Design a protein with these regions (language model features):
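Accessory beta-strand-rich segments of carbohydrate-active enzymes
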Residues: 3-15, 45, 49-150, 175-176, ...
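Substrate-binding clefts and catalytic carboxylate motifs of secreted carbohydrate-active enzymes
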Residues: 4-5, 11-15, 75, 123-124, ...
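Active-site-adjacent substrate/metal-binding segments within catalytic domains
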Residues: 34-60, 65-83, 89-92, 141, ...
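Short, hydrophobic beta-strand segments
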Residues: 102, 206-216, 665-671, 764-783
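Extended acidic/polar, glycine-enriched regions
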Residues: 107-109, 169-252, 670-673, 682, ...
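Short flexible loop/turn segments that cap and initiate beta-strands
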Residues: 179-184, 219-225, 631-633, 639-641, ...
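Short aromatic-acidic-glycine turn motif
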Residues: 189-196, 655, 700, 742-758, ...
Length: 818
């Protein structure tokens, strides 16, 4: 078998134009569209339109006979694959892997034209930024007539102690009459553990005994190298290489979740699939970076909201140690937007679930499958029956992993009364399309009542979920699941221990600012196994639902053009942790150091419009050039008993912190260009301190890369922070300064932008503006060895450069997933 990455050297065009551009995959076509206040997608996609696109590539087929197919990890959406003008396959859904067999259509030993037609023109079809085009990898598979099916290797750890027992099922396409054998070997240093079996119709089943077993967990992500070979008469017909961790899962209401028999609580982050300024394009290095930052900040689990997670992210979670709840869809058979996947649910749900499970089932990080999110029809008899069929289908593919679904009990209750709460959001989108194309339309909408309502939305949803009617509208669905997924329903956690004593609960979606109370319940109640905040990482689309505005700026739930970023992320789209992250780290006891945050001194705080999914607008900075003499509101996050805050050595007082104060101490003082120091104490003893400094001396640009060496494979990317700093290296809170980035040598500029929630420029341009002193550039390596010179320039603050190296020698970024 030859398995070749097929990402490089494509041509791409909008279907409505003749002009073509050379592109390498992954590629997000939506990111190249012009955002507009009149976009039919509205705030869902951050005011990006969809479109129709054509990708094409000329490929010289080998002269040798054999099975040839193309394997697509993700195309958004309604794709058709053509070979020499003849249709070979495709996929309706935008998040489903699929294979297109092409050997019967190619001319052997000659050039062949591969085309992929993509139609994302029906709008709206998503509640968030979807991207468009071939946004994940494409593989060329050249195989014999006897082959291991894609996703056809299924490993399950049956017993785990000093030795481990692993069951292996290998699914085979056996088109010949030969006597075919399967051999599976697992190795972690030393000699491999292996087993061999003859292939029966459909495949083979084997049992492998692994001595001196080293288990996989998020705390200790040990991975074995696995080789699966298909042989006949000593000839290797096909093989797959993968990595696998020995891991068992048990869950019940009395003992909670156990991984390898060890009690485990899930510190979870809901994440969308987009990569911030890279749009929907999935780059392996970007997924590893995101997983690494999430792990460093204290998360041990992610929920893929609300579509199957990428293979690259799965590899990252396996390697770095993150548990995964992989989710299949946001819709079943009732639409949430006019043209979404509900319209073809009946014909696609089985294939979509199967693709997800077959992708996931060799990954030890995957500890839960979710069959949907906020499916209001799950409160109906028809929906419960659909759930029953879906759970059975998942179990037929992998019975070793529990199944859940994110259920919003308030929505179920409303649906039972004939109300569709998603319809109101569509009306708001239509209303927002009247906004101007300059900056958010200003109107006198702010009021004490509005801010009170928005700040209490999470509590209102939880209280609604606690009503008997919500229980009645949801219990049938929960009876079908292994784990009941509660969206915004923490008010039920304690009472449902009595009402439903056998029910295991996970907080599939929660407000980040509820983490203190939620986590106390997770630690106390064995039937509640974790909490997944919305969101761990910020995302594009659902524009402005977590963004605070000021003065006469729009206070609507979803914000008008040009808002693009959602805003609720504990970590922003560039990878910088914010106040919600500091709160969670304090609650989880991840650090003894207090975290200082300051409400923005570059905005008018007298008229503040809160956002439903964000409890604070505070920023981790004391470098505000426009703040001199203004009143500063300071938040210090800590799990200590108390916090003292000092300004230039002068005490501003001592405040309670820790659980009694919601893990935050609040101070007020006049801003001055000095140094803030927070000191955390437990029983009077200092346990940690932190500092924020004001700006000192002249300002200049600084550019920093997350890596110095890139693989020269056309796929590796480096993330470069471009910052406005003072002479001491402190990032200064200035926004709006124009910035240009140039890339010379063996790399290209792939993305440039910032965490600005309402940018006017494009992430595909070489120019952007600083947002609170920062921007992010992403550089992609070419296939050439050499050097990449990246330079950032500002008219006012000069320039800064860094030189990176591209090398073919490294194998750390190798794409090995099966």
């Amino acid at each position: 078998m030859t398995r070749t990455l097929f990402d490089l050297g494509w041509e791409w065009r909008n279907a409505d134009t003749a002009a073509r551009q050379l592109v390498d995959l992954p590629h997000d076509a939506m990111l190249h569209e012009q955002r507009s206040a009149s976009s039919a997608n509205g705030s869902h996609t951050g005011w990006f339109p969809g479109g129709r696109y054509v990708y094409r590539k000329t490929w010289r087929a080998p002269a040798d006979p054999g099975r040839v197919s193309l394997f697509f990890e993700g195309v958004y959406r309604k794709s058709r694959v053509l070979v020499n003008g003849v249709e070979a396959g495709g996929c309706l859904g935008g998040y489903t892997e699929f294979e297109a067999r092409i050997d019967h259509l190619i001319e052997r030993g000659s050039n062949n034209l591969i085309e992929v037609h993509v139609d994302n023109s029906e709008e709206p079809n998503s509640r968030w930024y979807s991207g468009s085009g071939i946004y994940r990898h494409v593989w060329l598979l050249e195989q014999s007539s006897d082959r291991i099916k894609p996703g056809g290797v299924h490993l399950v750890t049956r017993a785990l102690g000093g030795t481990a027992s692993v069951s292996a099922r290998v699914e085979v396409d056996n088109d010949s009459s030969r006597d075919v054998q399967v051999r599976v070997s697992m190795q972690l240093g030393g000699s491999p553990a292996e087993a061999t079996a003859s292939v029966a119709p459909g495949g083979a089943e084997l049992e492998i005994t692994v001595p001196d077993a080293q288990p996989w967990s998020a705390e200790s992500p040990v991975l074995y190298d696995v080789l699966v070979e298909l042989t006949a008469d000593g000839e290797v017909l096909d093989q797959q290489e993968l990595r696998y961790g020995l891991r068992t899962i048990d869950v019940d209401a009395s003992r909670g979740l156990r991984i390898n028999s060890q009690p485990t609580l899930l510190r979870g982050a809901c994440i969308h699939h987009d990569s911030g300024i890279l749009g929907g394009a999935t780059f392996r290095a970007a997924e590893f970076r995101r997983a690494r930052i999430l792990r460093e900040q204290g998360f041990n689990a992610v929920r893929s909201s609300h579509n199957p997670i990428s293979r690259d992210m799965l590899d990252a979670c396996d390697e770095l140690g993150l548990y995964v709840m992989d989710e299949s869809s946001d819709v079943w058979f009732r639409t949430k937007t006019a043209h979404d996947a509900a319209l073809h649910f009946d014909e696609t749900w089985e294939a979509e679930l199967e693709a997800m499970v077959r992708k996931d089932r060799t990954h030890p990080s995957v500890i839960m499958y979710s069959i949907g999110n906020e499916i209001a029809e799950s409160g109906t008899a028809e929906g419960i029956e659909a759930a029953r069929r879906m759970v059975a289908h998942v179990k037929s593919l992998d019975a070793s992993v529990p199944v859940t679904c994110g259920v919003n009990l308030m929505l179920n209750m409303a649906a039972a009364r004939g109300k569709n709460l998603f319809a109101g959001h569509e009306k708001q989108n239509a209303k927002n399309q009247d906004a101007t194309a300059a900056r958010p339309k200003r109107k006198a909408l702010t009021s004490t009542g509005y801010n009170f309502l928005v700040s209490k939305l999470g509590s209102l949803m939880a209280r609604a979920a606690a009503l008997p009617a919500a229980d009645k509208a949801s219990r049938g669905m929960f009876d079908v699941l292994d784990v009941a997924g509660y969206n915004y329903a923490h008010a039920r956690y304690r009472k449902d221990r009595t009402l439903h004593p056998g029910r295991v609960i996970v907080g599939t979606e929660t407000m980040p600012f509820h983490i203190a109370g939620n986590w106390a319940l997770v630690e106390e109640l064995p039937h509640v196994i974790g909490d997944f905040m919305w969101t761990g990482w910020d995302y594009l689309g659902e524009a402005g639902i977590g963004t605070w505005t000021y003065g006469d700026e729009s206070a609507s739930f979803a914000k008008p053009y040009p808002y693009l970023v959602a805003g609720p992320g504990a970590i922003d789209i560039t990878g910088n942790p914010g106040a919600p992250m500091a709160l969670a780290r304090a609650v989880w006891g991840q650090t003894d150091e207090p975290a200082i945050f300051v409400r923005p001194l570059d905005r008018d705080l007298k008229r503040t419009n809160r956002a439903a999914w964000r409890a604070t607008d505070a920023v981790a900075s004391w470098a505000w050039p426009e703040g001199e003499g203004r009143r500063a509101e300071i938040e210090v996050y800590s799990n200590a008993d108390e916090v003292e805050l000092r300004l230039d050595g002068r005490s501003l007082g001592v405040r309670r912190a820790g659980r009694r104060a919601g893990f935050v101490a609040r101070f007020r003082t006049a801003y001055s260009s000095e140094t803030l120091v927070a000191i955390a104490r437990v029983q009077g003893r200092e346990v940690g301190r932190s500092t924020l400094a004001s700006a000192v001396g002249p300002l200049a640009l600084r550019i920093r890369s997350d890596k110095g060496v890139l693989d020269a494979d056309g796929q590796d990317v480096a993330h470069l922070a471009v910052e406005l700093v003072d002479s001491a290296g402190t990032v200064v809170m200035l926004s709006g300064e124009g910035l240009e980035v140039s890339v010379d040598g063996t790399g290209t500029l792939t993305g440039l932008g910032s965490a600005d929630p309402a940018p006017l420029g494009s992430y595909t341009d070489a120019r952007t503006e600083l947002f609170r002193g920062s921007a992010l550039a992403v550089v992609r390596a070419t296939t050439e060895q050499g050097e990449v010179r990246v330079t950032a320039r500002s008219r006012v603050y000069g320039e800064s450069s860094v030189t990176l190296t591209t090398s073919i020698a490294s194998t750390t970024g190798e794409l090995i997933h099966a």
